[in-house]
A protein has these predicted regions:
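Helix-coil boundary and interhelical linker segments in multi-pass alpha-helical membrane proteins
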Residues: 704-713, 779-805
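Membrane-helix interface motif
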Residues: 259-267, 774-791, 859-862
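Generic alpha-helical transmembrane segments
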Residues: 724, 805-822, 847
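Core segments of transmembrane alpha-helices
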Residues: 692-696, 764-773
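Membrane-water interface at loop-to-transmembrane-helix junctions
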Residues: 748-768, 797-809, 837
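Conserved cytosolic headpiece of P-type ATPases
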Residues: 1-746, 751-754, 811, 828-898
């Protein structure tokens, strides 16, 4: 690099002093939580805490029964089952989250040993990026990455890609105040750590290093844990509190009622009373244990784990398990523009260059190929990538798509002179001996159309300047970049000597278009919207989710992109868009008043999106944020769900909860659908298990008040718990997502997970089960029943002990009621028949396992399960009678559909 000035830079002593005073050029890595702490954190789940309490109480009961009542070791099955349920739920959640974390590369690793060219002691030298200190003089060349923040001392045709910090891919940098872009996010004479030089070169003095750089501030902010509670966590806490206080209330009622019954029925003696009181307390503790849905944590974990695995197939790599469900509660998505809504690759929108003759066609394609500093990486011919200026690269991509090899076109010419682009001249030129028109020397120029027009004396084709101006205005109103092309065939008799510097002489000789070039045409270049984005945005809007754009681009460009994807409409006013500087100037109160109506923040600074997220959260929105740049990291971390793009920066991925592998906005709609369906699956499990729990609690309550013992043995209850917990969780968690959920508005995050419809079903069906089971128990106790058909001719013969056959009938009826009710739970909130089995293979297999398992236990369980085999008639009668639960449910669903 040729320097305009002589710089001495720092000496060794100054380097040491500045390093001590301002710190090293290193980003503080995020604190890593030890593995054991991450595991222990799982025990903070409210339902897990309730289960732990229930497990301890269950152990106390078991020890009392084993040592005090001299019962067998089977009394320990219940507490063992509870702790197994706890370990399964925690273990699965921990395993899947750790597996997802390992699926991420080391995302926030920064190469601090990358060499950087600086001037020290008056000499250029290369040092490691980590060794840069404040006041170092750094040399920037094309392709280099700025190692720190600083102020430019020199800038020659310097263009920098700031997309990782502002979302803006190309920013012109200058040291001349008249060339400054007043609307730019950062000053035009300032460079930022992590940004890349796309064109030109420059020199800057370092002002900030490490965590003090803009990149560093974003990196540090992205590590802040805001401890935002997910909607599901809030709901499970409420459910846990409801179960806890309900069971405690019923337990107190039982204790008071039994004490009252004691004084009404027995003569008081302290020994007798204490024994009775201890028995009553054991019954109360049993009820509390029965009331706890120990399968719920496992059901939630299974649902989340299943969704994580299936969402990966739809290009959503979920890192944090609860993010699956939180997507379903999302009310607002804040997205950046570049790379998320658009392709982040400049492409030719339309080109209008005269090709009416073979010569004109040759001039057009040769001019595009040779008058360019960009090139293409064609290692993947189907997906070429641009190297160099994105705008020039777009023209080469257009040539490539038309089947022309720009490399061959360049190889066939002899370049005589080149005029690089400059902000002063606003055009560039190349003088060549043509390969397509042998023997001719041609000057090609391109640049701002008004500048190119100045140098032209005529136009190719039959278009007028008015036509061209009208077309340019139309494109510019669509926020597109426009360029003009012109050429001149230099005659052999030309007065100019063909050597380096001749292009400037030719252009300077042209006065007001006299003896000028021939205008070839114009081109519109834009970063096109991804094809799938408009439909994806429409899907989100139809689902009641607002989408807001936060970008470093201009308001005009942002509004045009918003219009193309369906976010910005004709009804929207200026109040719906704001610039970063205006946004920063808003007070918290003013922001609170405007935040719901804002649709676009243009020229946004790195921390603007984070402030927007926090303002939306203060308005009780559930916020998801998409982003691919380092500038997005704080907002990704602060949001309820952070969605990074697969080709985003490592800092963005580290801060996110979900990575969209294919960078497609449409994958976000799939994630919302999975989240909403997952929440419904959890509701279905709660509906199923709470119905069983209500029936079980009422049976314990009735038994306590009537003085009867439970007709179900410990081993039978273990099988019932296995059905209620593991099998039901697996069956209902594996239900596929429903497209229908995308027609609904987002649920109110404050609305209880047990909605009124569920409450009615839980109390109604649970109460009905209790009445049926209590009635059956009464009939079995007051008359000998050798077959189910005996119930048709039943008459009371007085109370007696139940036989094993009668206990087997009661046990099977109890299980089959739950079996059929599982079908009702599956159909909840679908609006369809329970026999709609599409994509429900897992559910079908599990209910078949339950049914076959019940038959095997009853027919072959013997003493272990305290059962005797039932005849075929009994089985048919039990199946038919208990299936009424399903048929009544189907009838009610049919009525509701009509």
């Amino acid at each position: 690099m040729e320097l305009k000035k002589i710089y001495t830079g720092l000496n060794a002593q100054e380097v040491a002093e500045n390093r001590k005073k301002y710190g090293e050029n290193l980003l503080t890595p995020p604190a890593q939580i030890p593995l054991w702490k991450r595991f222990i954190t799982k025990f903070k789940d409210p339902l897990i805490i309730i289960l732990l309490v229930a497990g301890v109480l269950s152990i106390a009961i078991s020890f009392y029964e084993y040592h005090g009542l001299h019962e067998g070791t089977e009394v320990f099955f219940e507490p063992v089952g509870i702790f197994i349920a706890i370990l399964l739920a925690i273990g699965m959640a921990f395993f899947f989250e750790e597996k997802a974390n390992r699926a991420f590369a080391i995302l926030n690793q920064v190469d601090d040993d990358e060499p950087v060219e600086v001037i020290r002691d008056g000499n250029p030298k290369k040092i490691a990026k980590r060794d840069i200190v404040v006041d170092d003089i750094v040399l920037l060349n094309t392709g280099a990455e700025a190692p720190a923040d600083g102020k430019l001392l020199e800038a020659i045709s310097l263009h920098i890609d700031e997309s990782t910090l502002t979302g803006e891919p190309i920013c012109h940098k200058s040291t001349h105040e008249e060339d400054f872009d007043k609307d730019a996010t950062f000053p035009s004479d300032y460079v930022l750590r992590g940004t890349k030089v796309m064109e030109g070169h420059g020199v800057f003095r370092v002002e900030k290093v490490g965590d003090n750089t803009e990149n560093g501030k974003v990196f540090v902010a992205s590590q802040i844990d805001n401890s935002v509670k997910t909607p599901l966590t809030e709901q499970l806490e409420r459910l846990g509190n409801l179960i806890t206080w309900s069971s405690y209330t019923i337990a107190v009622i039982i204790l008071i009622a039994r004490i009252a019954m004691f004084f009404l029925s027995y003569d008081f003696t302290w020994v007798h009373f204490l024994q009775y009181l201890l028995d009553s307390i054991m019954i109360c503790v049993t009820l509390i244990v029965v009331a706890v849905p120990e399968g719920l944590p496992m059901a939630v974990t299974l649902s989340l784990a299943y969704s994580m695995r299936r969402m990966l197939k739809t290009n959503n790599l979920v890192r944090k398990m609860h993010a699956c469900e939180t997507m379903g509660a999302t009310t607002v998505i804040c997205t950046d523009k570049t790379g998320t809504l658009t392709q982040n690759q400049m492409r030719v929108y339309k080109i209008e260059v005269d090709c009416s003759s073979e010569e004109h066609k040759a001039l057009a394609k040769e001019g595009i190929a040779v008058n360019s500093t960009a090139s293409l990486d064609l290692s993947d011919a189907q997906h070429p990538t641009v190297l160099g200026n994105p705008t020039e690269g777009a023209l080469l991509l257009w040539l490539h798509e038309k089947g022309y090899d720009y490399r061959q076109l360049r190889a066939d010419v002899e370049i005589i002179d080149e005029l690089p682009f400059s902000t002063e001249r606003k055009c560039m030129g190349t003088l060549v001996r043509s390969g397509l028109l042998p023997g001719k020397t041609i000057l090609y120029i391109k640049g701002a159309t008004d500048i190119i027009r100045y140098y032209c004396s005529d136009i190719m084709g039959d278009r007028s300047w008015d036509d061209i101006t009208a077309q340019l205005l139309k494109w510019q109103n669509q926020a597109m970049r426009t360029l003009g092309f012109a050429c001149m065939i230099i005659p052999d008799s030309s007065e100019f000597k063909l050597h380096e510097g001749v292009i400037s002489q030719i252009l300077d000789s042209i006065k007001d278009g006299n003896n000028g070039l021939t205008f070839q045409g114009i081109v519109a270049i834009a970063d096109p919207v991804r094809k799938e984005v408009p439909d994806a945005v429409r899907e989100c809007l139809d689902a009641g989710i607002d989408v807001k754009i936060v970008t470093g681009d201009t308001p005009g460009t942002a509004k045009e992109i918003g219009r193309q994807v369906g976010i910005w409409t004709e009804k929207d006013c200026d109040r719906c868009v704001i610039t970063g500087s205006e946004f920063e100037a808003l007070s918290d109160k003013e922001l609170s008043e405007r935040v719901n109506s804002l649709k676009i923040i243009a020229r946004a600074r790195p921390m603007d999106k984070k402030r927007l997220v926090e303002a939306l959260q203060a308005k009780h929105h559930v916020v998801a944020v998409t982003g691919d740049g380092t500038n997005d990291a704080p907002a990704l971390k602060a949001a309820h769900v952070g969605l990074s793009m697969g080709d985003g920066t490592s800092v963005a991925k580290e801060a996110s909860d979900i990575t969209i592998i294919d960078n497609s906005f449409s994958s976000i709609g799939r994630a919302v659908m999975w989240g909403r369906s997952l929440y419904q699956n959890i509701q279905r499990f709660i509906l199923f298990q709470m119905t069983v729990n209500v029936a079980a609690c009422l049976i314990v309550l009735a038994g306590a008040l009537l003085g009867t013992q439970s007709p179900l043995t410990v081993t039978q209850m273990l099988w019932v718990n296995l059905i209620m917990d593991t099998f039901a969780a697996m069956a209902l968690a594996s239900l596929p997502p429903s497209e229908a959920v995308m027609q609904n508005k987002p649920r109110d995050r404050k609305a209880f997970i047990i909605n009124p419809s569920m409450s009615r079903q839980i109390i109604g069906v649970g109460g009905l089960f209790f009445i049926l089971l209590l009635g059956l128990l009464y009939m079995l106790e007051y008359a000998p029943i050798n077959s189910m058909t005996d119930l048709l001719t039943w008459h009371s013969t007085g109370p007696r002990e139940l036989t094993n056959h009668e206990l087997s009938i009661f046990f099977t009826v109890f299980v089959m009621l739950q079996f059929w009710n599982m079908f009702n739970a599956r159909a909840f909130a679908t609006g369809k028949s329970t026999f709609h089995f599409k994509d429900c293979k897992g559910f079908g297999i599990i209910v078949l396992v339950i049914f076959i398992g019940q038959i095997i236990i009853v027919q072959f369980g013997g003493k272990m399960f305290n059962v005797t085999p039932l005849c075929l008639t009994d089985w048919i009668a039990i199946i038919v009678v208990t299936s009424l639960v399903l048929w009544v449910g189907e009838l009610l669903r049919l009525i509701n559909r009509k």
